[in-house]
Amino acid sequence: AGLDLGAASXFGALAFEGVA
């Protein structure tokens, strides 16, 4: 999920991965 959202958001990966 982190990679999917990150690719779409660009910077979302960093925030998502940190939370996950």
UniProtKB/Swiss-Prot annotation:
* Subcellular location per the Swiss-Prot or TrEMBL entry: Secreted, Extracellular space
Q: What is its main location?
A: secreted
The alphabetical list of record keywords is: Antifreeze protein, Glycoprotein, Secreted, Stress response
Q: Name one GO cellular component term.
A: extracellular region
Query: Induced by what?
Result: By low temperature.
The record describes its post-translational modification as: N-glycosylated and O-glycosylated.
Q: What is the residue range of the signal peptide feature?
A: none
Q: How does activity depend on pH?
A: Optimum pH is 9.3.
What is this protein for, i.e. what is its function? Antifreeze proteins bind to the surface of ice crystals and inhibit the growth of these crystals, this inhibition causes thermal hysteresis. Causes the shape of ice crystals to change from hexagonal to a bipyramidal shape with rugged facets. Inhibits recrystallization of ice crystals.
Q: What is this protein called?
A: Antifreeze protein
Protein's organism: Antarctomyces psychrotrophicus
